Each structure stands twice: as C-alpha cells, then as structure tokens.
Amino acid sequence: MAIINMSDLDLQGKRVLIREDLNVPVSNGVVTSDARLRASLPTIELALAKGAAVMVMSHLGRPTEGEYNSEFSMQPVVDYLAKALSCTVRLATDYLDGVEVAVGEVVVFENVRFNKGEKKNDEALSKKMAALCDVYVMDAFGTAHRAEASTNGVGLHAPIACAGPLLAQELEALGKALDNPARPLVAIVGGSKVSTKLTVLESLSGIVDQLVVGGGIANTFIAAAGHNVGKSLYEADLIDEAKRLVANAQSRGGDIPVPTDVVVAGEFSPTAAATLKAVNEVGDSDMIFDIGPDSAEALAKIIESAGTIVWNGPVGVFEFDQFGEGTKRIAQAIADSKAFSIAGGGDTLAAVDKYDIADKVSYISTGGGAFLEFLEGKELPAVAMLKQRGA
C-alpha cells in the first residue's frame, strides 16, 4: 500500500492543513531552540509555492487538555514563522467552526491540545478538523506514534490525506536502515534502563549483526556477565533477560560485547573524580559512568566495519566531560564512517551537537518516541492511517 506524498499533488487554490511538530522550548515568549521549526519550513514553503492556502497545526508543551493557557500558546511560533517566511502568518484561536485563509498566506492554529478530545482521537473533533481542508498533510514524525485527533483521526476523514516531505524523508531513511540495510548492520543502544528499551533490544537483536549497549543498560549486561557493578544503576531483575538477549545475538553469529574497561567514580556529580578500571576490578562503592578507552576503541572498530549504523543513546554520562570520552569516541567513529548512519533520540542528538558531527551523520531523526517505536518494529498509527488512505 503506497502512501500519497504531498510533493506529488496539485495544491493550486486548495486549502491545505499541515500537522507539523512545532513543539519547541519557549522562554518569556521567545523560542529558545528552533531545530523543529527549521525542519518544518521546507514543507510549508513547498505548499505555498504550489499555490495553496496553508493552515498549520501542532501541540506545544503539556497544557491541561481542553483549557486555554497563554503559557502554551503558539504565538511565539507564529512570531518566528512570520520572520522566516516571506508571507503573512497569523494565529487563529477559534478555528474549529471554520477559518478564512487566502492563497499565499499561512494561518497557524492555536495549540491543538487546547481542544477537548485531542489526545483521545475524538471522532467529532477529528471530523471538524477534516472539514477545514481539501488536503491534510501529516508531516510530524515526532508524534506519528500517537493516535490523536490532529495526527490520526483528521486524516481518516479529510478528502485527501498525504505525507509531507519531512515525514516521507524520515520513513525512507528508517526503511533504508532497517528494511534493506547494507551489512554489517550495527546498532548502538544507550540509555539508563534496560526496561525502557527492552522491546527495542529484542527487536534489534533479531536483525542486527552487532548490537552495542551503553550507559546504564550496559551495567545490567556487565552484571549478567558475572562482574561486580558496585553501586551503579542496573536492573537485577533483568539479568536473565540480558543473558537471553546475548544468547539470541550469538545464535545468529552476532554478539552484545561487554566493556573490558570502565570509568568509575564514588558519586554522581559534575566534579566527581574519574578513575579507569578493568571491568573485573570494580569495587563495591564504585559507580560506572562510562566505558574505558580499550572498550571505546573496540567499539570504534566495530563501527568502522559497518555498512549501516543505527545510534540511539550515549554510552556514558557525557554531560560531564570526565565521563564523555566513550561517547565522544563513538561519535567520531560514526562521523568517520562511510556507512549509512541514522541517529535519533534526545540524548543522542545532544551528543551529536556536543561533538559537532551533525553534518557527518547521514540522517538525524526528529522523533524520540516515534524513532524508538519504529526500531521496535511497530507500525506507527499515523503511517497506518496514511497507508489506509493511500490504498
């Protein structure tokens, strides 16, 4: 089932409603990080260039649903877009019963979460949104894993529902990495807990050639290998699960390597003194915060030989420089690799920024939860809806 792409449609004179992910941090009425806004501009500009009357909607923050709260207003986003686009951009507060929009202008709807029923994918609300447009464009990969009125329901009732360029690009990159990857396929999964990434680890251990774990997740695997992890964050109840994942990977000719050396400290703080130890020398009062240089080099070699790299999560507490060398080495190896690489997840993107490798990663995913659910092998509700409407 093919998904209809916005770029293939004739939009001349059409009312086009675009769902973007414009959920950006705002301080004192000013947008403080504009990455998502910049990512959405090409889609809005393309719709304008195609002669459409453009309406844009998004959520912003977590207001109480159904209640207006000026703290979560889209006004700062409107102010930003008004400067970035060479056309009229205005905010519409009461839009569900109809809104005037002319060809060549952009109307931004007030925060969709001010509407009661948004999160529950309310059918009456979805139909009201759908009645506003000739074409609905889903372009918000970051919210594609949520079945809500503005991301799912509206698309089921709109005359035409299609994928915007940003969403299409995202799905193409993820498909390239997971559906038909150049081998060896290497996945790096970091983060603090195995429990939050268990389904990702299970899904990936069945398709990747090499699975690398880092951060707090690695501590559980270190414990599963029989080593002391001291006072480190780990999940004792998931040790058997970790052993099963290792056995699963090895049965396919892969592995989940455990670090041979680690960086430890006695406390979690920006000023904690870092000590390098062999993995079998970790003491009862030690906390593991990073992989050591030997382990980092071993992982860099795995990355160098990869055909495809999927990166989700740092391998240490890189926010503190003394525990950032492992993640820095991984980032450098990915940057130096000629493999197709995709990075996603908030902490990962922070590491990409910190080590300045954004232009060296083949594709940077805008989705956090959606990226994870895609890695888990789940079909995202927004994608299922677009396939249904494209059939």
Curated annotation (Swiss-Prot):
Keyword Metal-binding: no
Assigned keywords, A-Z: ATP-binding, Cytoplasm, Glycolysis, Kinase, Nucleotide-binding, Transferase
Pfam families the UniProt entry points to: PGK
Entry GO MF terms: ADP binding; ATP binding; phosphoglycerate kinase activity
Gene Ontology cellular-component terms listed: cytosol
Catalytic activity: (2R)-3-phosphoglycerate + ATP = (2R)-3-phospho-glyceroyl phosphate + ADP
Main location, first listed in the record: cytoplasm
Involved pathway(s): Carbohydrate degradation; glycolysis; pyruvate from D-glyceraldehyde 3-phosphate: step 2/5
SUPFAM superfamilies assigned to the protein according to its UniProt record, in alphabetical order: Phosphoglycerate kinase
UniProt cross-references to InterPro entries, sorted A to Z: Phosphoglycerate_kinase, Phosphoglycerate_kinase_CS, Phosphoglycerate_kinase_N, Phosphoglycerate_kinase_sf
Subunit structure: Monomer.
The protein's name in its UniProt record: Phosphoglycerate kinase
Species this protein is from: Shewanella sp. (strain MR-7)
Protein encoded by which gene: pgk
